[in-house]
Every structure is written in structure tokens, then in C-alpha cells.
């Protein structure tokens, strides 16, 4: 029997949303919270007071400058060089302090570096001792091997010379090998 399957098609419908643009997106739908309202009620008087004080200070400075300007004009040959000298002195003190602070921080860095390096020095010294001992052992073994090689070659040469010395018997015409070792 044939298996008949029916394929069902499903259709999904998505509702279209209207675009809410403009300034409404930036504000919450429910309105300001109680903390925001409290911040406005406290912040506006404090901000206004500080702004008023700043304005009064600016006005006082301008009025004081207008009143003092004739005195500055009269005493300018004395005031300008004095202000220049005071400015240079202050610059010198500030530069001296900055250089001193830089030197102090540099010394602190060097001391911390030495302190950190001092913690690793015993480990490095121990490692260097082991490497030096290994190298000395290696050099000793190589020297021993070289000495043994030289001794073996000298023995071979001595052996070759002892057996190569031939005694000629001229009457018989034969060569006799003579051992020249002394006992």
C-alpha cells in the first residue's frame, strides 16, 4: 500500500508596528521617577545659588580690576619686573619639586627592581653552580679521554718501533726481528 502523506502549509502573520519616532522614544512612557523629581527640586536651587555666586565673583573681579588699573599703570615699572621675578621663582620651585619627585620615584623603582631581583639571585646562583659543575665534569672527562688517546698512540708508536728494529745478519742474508725491550 502506498503511504500518502499530506503536507500542511503554515502561514505566519506578523502584525505591522507603527514606527514611534521623534522625541517620544527618548522619554519613558510612565513619566519621571520620584528620584528624578527629587534631584530636580534639590539641584535647581543649589545650581542657581552657585551660578549667582560665580556671577558676583566675576563682577567683583571686574570692578576691582577697573579700580586697580590706574595704580597698576602708575606702579608698572616696579610691579612688572617684580611679577616677572616672582613668576620665575615660582617656576623654579615647581620645577625643583617636579625633579625631586621624579628622582624619588626613580629611586623607588630601582630599589623595588633590586629587591625583586634579589629574590631570584639565589636560584640563579644555584643554577650557575650546577652548570659550572657540569661543565667542569665535562672538561675533566674530555681531558681524561684526550690523555688516554695520547697514551694509546704513544704506546702504539713505541710498540711499532720496538718490533721494527731489525737485526741484519749479513752472513746468512736473513732478517731477524729483535726485541729491544729491556727487562
Curated annotation (Swiss-Prot):
Signal peptide: none
Keywords: Lipid droplet, Membrane, Transmembrane, Transmembrane helix
Chief location: other
Pfam family, one: Oleosin
Any Gene Ontology biological process: reproductive structure development
UniProt xrefs under PANTHER family: OLEOSIN, OLEOSIN 5
Designated name of the protein: Oleosin 5
Species the sequence originates in: Arabidopsis thaliana
Lineage, top ranks: Eukaryota, Viridiplantae, Streptophyta, Embryophyta, Tracheophyta
Amino acid at each position: 500500500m502506498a503511504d500518502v502523506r499530506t503536507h500542511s502549509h503554515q502561514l505566519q502573520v506578523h502584525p505591522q508596528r507603527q514606527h514611534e519616532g521623534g522625541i517620544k522614544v527618548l522619554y519613558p512612557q510612565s513619566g519621571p521617577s520620584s528620584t528624578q523629581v527629587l534631584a530636580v527640586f534639590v539641584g535647581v536651587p543649589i545650581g542657581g545659588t552657585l551660578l549667582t555666586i560665580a556671577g558676583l565673583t566675576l563682577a567683583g573681579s571686574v570692578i576691582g580690576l577697573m579700580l586697580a588699573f590706574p595704580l597698576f599703570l602708575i606702579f608698572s615699572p616696579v610691579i612688572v619686573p617684580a611679577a616677572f621675578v616672582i613668576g620665575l621663582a615660582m617656576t623654579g620651585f615647581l620645577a625643583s619639586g617636579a625633579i625631586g619627585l621624579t628622582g624619588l620615584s626613580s629611586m623607588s623603582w630601582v630599589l623595588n627592581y633590586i629587591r625583586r631581583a634579589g629574590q631570584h639571585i639565589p636560584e640563579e646562583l644555584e643554577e650557575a653552580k650546577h652548570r659550572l659543575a657540569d661543565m667542569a665534569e665535562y672538561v675533566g672527562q674530555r681531558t681524561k679521554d684526550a690523555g688516554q688517546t695520547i697514551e694509546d698512540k704513544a704506546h702504539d708508536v713505541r710498540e711499532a718501533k720496538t718490533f721494527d728494529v731489525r737485526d741484519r745478519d749479513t752472513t746468512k742474508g736473513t732478517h731477524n726481528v729483535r726485541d729491544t725491550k729491556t727487562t
